[in-house]
Structure formats: structure tokens, C-alpha cells
Design a protein with these regions (language model features):
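Generic structural signal for well-ordered alpha-helices
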Residues: 66, 101-106, 140
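Structural recognition of the beta-strand scaffold that forms the well-ordered cores
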Residues: 17-20, 48-53, 76-81, 116-121, ...
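Oxyanion-hole/transition-state-stabilizing segment in secreted/luminal serine hydrolases
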Residues: 31-34, 45, 59-96, 126
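Active-site segments of SGNH/GDSL-like serine hydrolases
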Residues: 80-84, 107-139
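Solvent-exposed loop/turn segments at secondary-structure junctions
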Residues: 24-27, 54-59, 83-88, 123-127, ...
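Serine-esterase "nucleophile elbow" of acetyl-processing enzymes
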Residues: 1-55, 65-73
Length: 203
């Protein structure tokens, strides 16, 4: 799907550049190295994932970070920006969150017209971290709708987490919101490799 762009050396394709744009689920996610390794093996070219992400931040913050994403000149942008919008103590209204993600997507499409943009839903929330996000699914749906309205891709990782037994899920996400990096690598990275490179690659 992505052809190797030569940089003057016949056997040295340029790296595929990815920006992961999001919250602590990206900043602390730990799944990026596995994505780099898996996608590089699949595409037979280097892959570099850079994160523009900050724990505890919302889509309001993300609006101020679009310049950083654009400056990286990525080929692909992975976006998850709903999780903290939905918290009761940092409450960004559903309408405001939807407007913010729409504005972010419009800016990225205008300024990076060749980039492939993928909006993501990450993992399920539980315990206290879930209780303070009672309408999280509505925020995911709003961000999905804004992506699809623009013809952009949406990847939902939640069903893959929910295939785990309740005990395994609790072990994988001990605080109810942040998966252990090794589990995130096993669940998120392969799904992104398949989506980016095509189902004929990977496992």
C-alpha cells in the first residue's frame, strides 16, 4: 500500500513517518515500538513513530498542538483525543469535543493533504476511572462520526480488549484506564499493522 520512496540510494527507502496524537493512552501507551517493528517488517522499509501526546489533556489542548503535528510532516496520523474530554472533573461537553475534533481533522486535512488520518478508540475503562467517564462511549461515537463524515478511517481497539476474560482484562489494565505496555503492544500494534499495511501482511 505504501511504496518505498527512494532517497538517492537504491536500497535505502525513506522511513514511513507516523505521528501518534493523543492523551496518556499514547504518551504512556508503550505500543509504538511494536508498531514500528511490525510495520517495518511488513513493508520492508524503516518506520518511525513520533508522539505528540500529553497525559491528562483534552481536545482543547490538542487544538494548540496541530502545528507540532504538521511540522513532523507525517505520512500517517493516529489520533485518540476523547478519553479526558469525557472525564467529569475535566468535563469538555460532548458538543465541544465534537467541534474540537472536527476542527483538528479539518486543519490536518488542509495542511497535510497527502497524510493518511486514522482516528482510534483505544481500550475500555473500568473501576473509578470508568465511573468518572460515564459517557465515554458517546465521545467515541462523536469522534468516529466526525472522522467518517470526512471520509477518514476509524479503528476501534475496544473489541479486541474485550475478548480477554474479565480477570485477564483487569490484569492488563490494572488502574482501569492505562494498559500495561506489553499488553498494549500485543493488542494495538498488530491491529494497526493490518490496517495500515493490509490484511495480507502480519500474522
Amino acid at each position: 500500500m505504501f511504496s518505498a520512496v527512494k532517497n538517492g540510494h537504491a536500497d535505502s527507502p525513506q522511513p514511513l513517518k507516523i505521528v501518534a496524537f493523543g492523551t496518556s493512552l499514547t504518551a504512556r501507551g508503550g505500543w509504538q515500538p511494536a508498531l514500528e517493528t511490525g510495520l517495518s517488517a511488513c513493508l520492508q522499509r524503516p518506520v518511525k513513530v513520533e508522539s505528540v501526546a500529553k497525559s491528562g489533556e483534552t481536545s482543547q489542548w490538542a487544538l494548540t498542538q496541530v502545528d507540532r503535528v504538521v511540522a513532523a510532516q507525517p505520512d500517517i496520523i493516529l489520533i485518540e483525543l476523547y478519553a479526558n474530554d469525557a472525564t467529569l472533573h475535566r468535563f469538555v461537553s460532548l458538543a465541544q469535543s465534537r467541534k474540537n475534533i472536527g476542527d483538528i481533522l479539518d486543519q490536518l486535512r488542509q495542511r497535510l493533504p497527502q497524510a493518511r488520518i486514522i482516528v482510534m478508540a483505544m481500550n475500555p475503562f473500568s473501576g473509578l476511572r470508568g465511573l468518572i467517564r460515564p459517557f465515554a462511549d458517546s465521545y467515541v461515537s462523536a469522534h468516529q462520526a466526525e472522522a467518517e463524515k470526512r471520509g477518514l478511517e476509524f479503528v476501534d481497539h475496544r473489541p479486541h480488549w474485550e475478548r480477554l476474560t474479565p480477570d485477564d482484562l483487569a490484569t492488563a489494565i490494572p488502574d482501569g484506564v492505562h494498559p500495561l505496555p506489553d499488553m498494549a503492544s500485543k493488542i494495538i500494534a498488530p491491529e494497526l499493522v493490518k490496517r495500515i499495511a493490509g490484511n495480507n501482511c502480519g500474522e
